[in-house]
Amino acid sequence: EVRILIKEESEEEKGDLFGLEKFQIGWYRDGMFISSHNPFVENNEQITQKADELKSTIKTFNQAFGVSLPIYNVISNMGSISDFCQFFSAFDESKRDDVFGATAPYSKHGGIDADWFNDEYDHLISELIANMSNALAGQLNQDYRNSIASAPFQFGLLKQNLWLFLNRLYRGEQLSDALQFRGFYFTHDGQSSAQSDLLASTVSYSVGHEHYQHNEQIPVNQTLFAQYLMTHVILSEHELV
C-alpha cells in the first residue's frame, strides 16, 4: 500500500503545502481520497479558488505517476455545521457507523453529472426527514430536539456550495478527460470545533440583518459515518485502478 499525504496545518504553523490548508489528500493503491475539514461555508470566489488549486495538485500527482486514480471526496468535519451531528445523538452505533454519502456510476471520461448529484443529495435529505421521528423519539433533551428538527435544513443549505466545488473540480477540459470522480461522503471525527449556523444566517440575511447571535451547541463526541467508508466503499472498488 502506498500513501501520499498532504497534511493539514494549523493556523499557528507557517504557510501551507501547495496552499491547500483545508484539504488532506491520501493516495492508496485503490484510489485517492480528498478529506476537506471545512464544509464549504466560504464565499463562491474562495470555493472556486480552492477547487482550482486542488485540481492542479491532483493533476500533477496523476501525471507524475502516470495514473488517473478514482477520487473520493470526504467532508470530514460535519460537527462544524450546527444541528447536523445532534440529529444522530440517540441512534445506536450501527446507524452511526453507516456510510452517509453517495458513490457515482463509473464514467470512463471522469467528471460529475449534475442530475446525479441533485438526485443523490436530495435522497440524503429525504433520509434525514424520514428518520426524524425516530431521532426525536430517542432524545428527551429539548435543545437536541430543536437541532433534530433543524438538521435537514442545515444539511440542505450545504448543497449549493458543495456542488460549486465539485463541479469546478471535476469539469473537463477541451483536450483532456476530467478527473475521475467517484463519490462524496460526510463524516464527523468526534472533535468539537467552531460552528456555522447556516439556517440562522440565511434567515437573518433574508430579513435584512447582516449579523445574528449564534449560540454554541453541546458538541457531539461520537464518531459518525467513518467506520466502513474505507472498507465498504473505497477498497471494494479496487478493480477500477
Language-model features: locations:
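Basic, amphipathic N-terminal segments
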Residues: 1-241
